[in-house]
Structures are given as structure tokens and as C-alpha cells.
Amino acid sequence: MSYILVTGGAGYIGSHTVVELVNNGYNVVVVDNLVNSSYDVIVRIEVLTRKQIPFFKIDLNDHDALDQVFKLYPIQAVLHFAALKAVGESTKFPLNYYSNNVGGAISLLKVMEENNVKNIVFSSSATVYGDATRFENMIPIPEHCPTGPTNPYGETKITIENIIRDVYANDKSWKCAILRYFNPIGAHPSGLIGEDPLGIPNNLLPFLAQVAIGRREKLSVFGSDYNSKDGTPIRDYIHVIDLAKGHIAALNYLFNHKDNGLCREWNLGTGNGSTVFEVFNAFCEAVGKKLPFEVVGRRDGDVLNLTANPKRANTELKWKAQLSINDACKDLWNWTTKNPFGFQINNYSWTKFDSESLTNYDRLNTVRTFNGKFEVSISNHGATIVAAKLNGIKLNLGFDNLKGYLREDNPFFGATIGRVANRISKGDLLINGTHYQVGLNELHRTSLHGGTYGYNKRTFLGPIVKTNEKEKETTMEFVLIDLDGTEGYPGDVETKVIYTVRDTGVGGELGIEYEAKLLEESGRDSTAVSLTNHSYWNIGNQPSIEGTHIKLVSNKHLESNPLDSTPTGKIVTSTDLDSQNSAKLGPDGPVFDYCFVTKQQDKLDTRNDELRVVATATHPKTRIAFTTLTTEPAFQFYTGDGVDVAGVFTKRSGFCLEASRYIYNPKWFIPLNKGEVYGSYTIYRFENF
């Protein structure tokens, strides 16, 4: 299996190209120093492509670190985007630009040569042409136009081009594509990735987008005295998706050029020039209102007209821009409204959860409420609630690192449970008249919580993190693709787990939304899904749950078979609750491990049902009230009497309140058919009283 290395793959153009690479069947490794980007871009690419992307935070000038990536992965080709790219900034800090851009490229080419990797697609720029209007008949600009950059940024690009040409001249086995592109705009139509400049944007549309959402007062138009139809500069604006596809076309061209090496330049543009005001008006139309602007002096290094002649790319690469400026403006506005602060979320942070891994697949993602009272940490491993804290008091049982969750005696602490929660007798799953044998993992008698390789053992993609300061909430969306046949379950299922951390004023709450569906490409038409969270709670800030007062909404629960704890099909009345459906938990009792029912199970998606309080727990020592609300028809209440984690936790260290469907029984079971959606919503609320 070979890989394409993408430098600067967390950047604007690089990230969109990574998506296109994956969509075209390539395996990708990304390196980026994250100076002008965020790792959250990689997270979103993974969710968008449903594929893990190996990532390394590396500066290209670090030869040894870069070389290690080439040693770990069989690199077939390199797409080189990594660079500082602001024209105006380059005039103020030229040495930084030469050191980073040129120095980084030299380091990369050395490592490539040492590892016998001789295919490169270089992200150059139309700025290498400088002011092409100084020549006759050079607008639109062809590749044979004489170069003459007017700023240090452009100089770094032409310098790197010349270095690549020298490398090829010395060794004709190299295959080098130099792509000179013009003004990329827009965003991915999903709204998941787009341009997110850290600090003040240097380009027209990112700045204008921030004006539209109120982050900037007005747009500054740099000069209205150019020799154009409205006095503003002319640029060839190209949708970033078209640009990304141009890189795929160039890469394929290199691979299809079998006989010998090559080094060639191609312009990537639309061939149509637009003025600043024309693009401004198109974006205002997408937004639906006129935006404020003022005309200021020209920007150092800017030229009148940079419009591409893309005929060479059209003919040789079989590539042509398909999307319009209006398309780009609509996609940019979609990205901006969904991500008003880009990837910058102040109350979210992450750390590696698996300290021994070279990748970042297993992370610990932490969100704090805006008042600072409530904090929740979720791992990608099992989309697990690792820690929940109210005013510094930990509310749940868990481990400090991934190793703890991999222990054999881990009783599913905090994990997302699926594909089917709780027990299936003999692993015999009946779906629409067909029997399926699912994995047995409990004394060879039952399938418990999805089997040996249930959702609790899986690494979820994500999270996509978004914040809403007005609603005082932040969401983390995790995604898992569970393939047909895993643990014997039929069908390819996409599962989303969306956690919402919300400020309640006197505390905080954690919402858990589940959504699952069979993928269209799945070869099965039906499957089984039943999801829950298996957190163990302890609100007493002490080793046991002793002294906790519990009040349940129902005293009716499913009767269990004493041999394997699976339901008999009957609903019975609990004898362990008082007349108020309450109980005080002591050191040894009462013992609960029942699936309490609150309503009839008759829906696959309960998210539109009433959100009802089903349980309340309080503790006099901490004066914490823990309320469980759910749309689900049942909940499992378990006092943790079987917990025995050697040297860490003992019985009754915590209790479970798992909002769920009825435990599997053909009598109540509702299958998930293709085209349908499984859904539920639960809230865990923690407040002081």
C-alpha cells in the first residue's frame, strides 16, 4: 500500500486536496507545522471522508523528523503546499519567507532524494509572473510569460520552481508538476472545511466573510485607481474544489507518464478575470445584504491583472474549472455561517490519550461551560465519557489514560455501547425472520454490549466541535462506520454520537444524541441497533455510592431470566423501591440491576418525543443533584455490585443510569431498515442544591 504525502495538508488548499485524494482512492499522510492552521481540519477531513488520516506535526526544516515519516510510510509522491503565503506580510518579513518557504522546500527535496521518492506536485503561484501587463499579449497569462515577482512571497515561489528544475536537470528520472494557480476562493460544500486564517485575513473573501458575521467592521479595498472597468484589481478567482481537482489531475498525469521523467508548469485558473468589486457584489448577493467597505491605498506588491490562460492544463491534464464565483460565494457563506469562528473554539481543547501512539487517532477532548463550572472530557476510544466535573468534583468513574480502558476488567466505564446494548440470549438475533449469530462474550451464553469488539473498543472519528455562545452550549460530534459482519451483525451502519455540554446557570448538563442508519451502499436491507452510554456515576465525592438518594419515575421493569439476565418477555414491579419509587443506597444494598420501563417501545427514532425526567439522584455531602432526562422508553439502573477493577474500583463505587431501548427480545424488537433512521436523546444534568 503506497501513500501520497501532503505537506501543509491542514491548510486551506491542502485540506481540500486531501479530501479529493481520498475520494479518488489514494492513501494520504499529512505533515504540517500548524503555524497557520489547526489539527481540527484533519479531524473534519476524517469525518468527511470516513477515513483516518495519519498526521505528523513537523516543520519541513526538521530533516530527521521528516525522514522518519518517509521511513514509516511507503511514499509514492509528494504534494507540496506548506508555505507562508501572505503577499503583504512577505514584504515586511522577507527573511521569514525565504527561510520557511525556500528552506523548507530544500529540506523536503533532500529527504525525497534520500528515500528515492521522485514524484512531486508543487503548489506555486501566479505571483511568479509579477505584472504581466508590462508585456504585450500576455493577458490572460500563459505559462511562457516571462516571470518577475514583485514581492518576496512570489520570489520564494519562483526560487523553489528553479530549484525543482535544477533537480530535474541533474536527474531526469524525476517527475515534477509545477502548478501556478491564481486566487482560490470558496469552501467545501459540506461546510466542514474552509479557509480559517488565524488573525486578520489577508485575502478578499475571508475578510469579507468576517465582516458579514460581525467580526470585522468593514472591508478595505486596496486601491480603486487601477486601469480596470471599476478601478479595482482584476484576478482569476477559482473555486478551491476545482483547484484541488487540478492537483489530482496533475498527479495522475505524472503517474501516467511512464517512459521518462518530466518537469512542466501548468496554470490552474478559470481564464476569466473578475474585479474586486464584482466578487464583492457576488458575495453580498450570497449573504443577502450589502456589506460595508472603504477604499484605501494600494497594497505593496499588488498588480493590475492576474488572469490565467489555462489551455495547457485543459488540454494536457484534461482538467477544467467547473464552478463559478457565485458557487464559491455560496459555499463560503455556508462555511462561515456554520463556523463563524472557524476552527477557533476557546472552551475546547484536546490532548493525546494514547501517549505511546505516533498518531492522534485516540484523543481526549475536553469542553468547559462558559461559566467554568462544568467540564466534560470524551475520548475517541469508544466515544467514552472519561471525566465529568462540577466545580472541580469528579462525577464519574474512569481511568487517566487509554491503557486503563483496555484492561480486561474494565466494566465498560463511560463507553458508547453498540451495536446492540445489553444482552442477547445465546447471541441469537432475529431480524425480519432471519437469524443471525452475533458474538458471544459473556460465559459463552450471551452477547453482551455488542460482543468482544463492540463500540466500546472502537476508535470514533471526530469530534466536529461547534459552539453557540448565545445558547451557552458546545457540541462534539463523533462518527463510527460499523461494517457488515462485525461481531456477526448485518449491514454497514453509520453511527453518530453528539455530545452537548451546556451551562444551566447553577451547574451544567451533558446531552447525548444518537443517530444511526444503514449506508446506501450496504448490501443488507435490515439490521439491529440499540445504543446507550455506560457511565458509572458517583456524586458523593467518596469511594462508594453510600448515602445517595435515588428517585425513579417508574417501578416497572423487565423480568430477567436468572440464568443469563435476559428478559423473559414480562414486565414486573420492583420490590426494592418505596411507595415514592425512591431508595437510599447503602454500602451493600439495595441491589439494582433492572431495565425500568417508562412507556411502550414503538418507535425507531424517539428524538421528537417528550424529554422526560426518569431519575433523580442527590447526595447530602456534596449537595449535588443529578437528573436524567430522556426520550427513550426505558433505562437500566445498576448499582455496580459486580464492579471489581483490581487496585482501582470495587463494588458499588458507582451506579449506572443508562437510557435505552428495552433489552433485546423478539417480542419488542424494532429493526432498522435501509432508508430509516434510529435516534434518541438523553440529558445528564448536574446542579448544586
Swiss-Prot record:
In the N-terminal section; belongs to the NAD(P)-dependent epimerase/dehydratase family. In the C-terminal section; belongs to the aldose epimerase family. One of its GO terms (molecular function) is aldose 1-epimerase activity. Induction: By xylose. It comes from Pachysolen tannophilus (Yeast). NCBIfam families: galE, PRK10675.1. NAD(+) binds at residues 3-34. InterPro entries: Ald1_epimerase_CS, Aldose_1/G6P_1-epimerase, Gal_mutarotase_sf_dom, Galactose_mutarotase-like, GH-type_carb-bd, NAD(P)-bd_dom, NAD(P)-bd_dom_sf, UDP_G4E. GO terms for cellular component: cytosol. Residues 1-345 are annotated as: Galactowaldenase. This is Bifunctional protein GAL10. Its EC number is 5.1.3.2, 5.1.3.3. Residues 346-689 are annotated as: Mutarotase. Pfam families: Aldose_epim, GDP_Man_Dehyd.
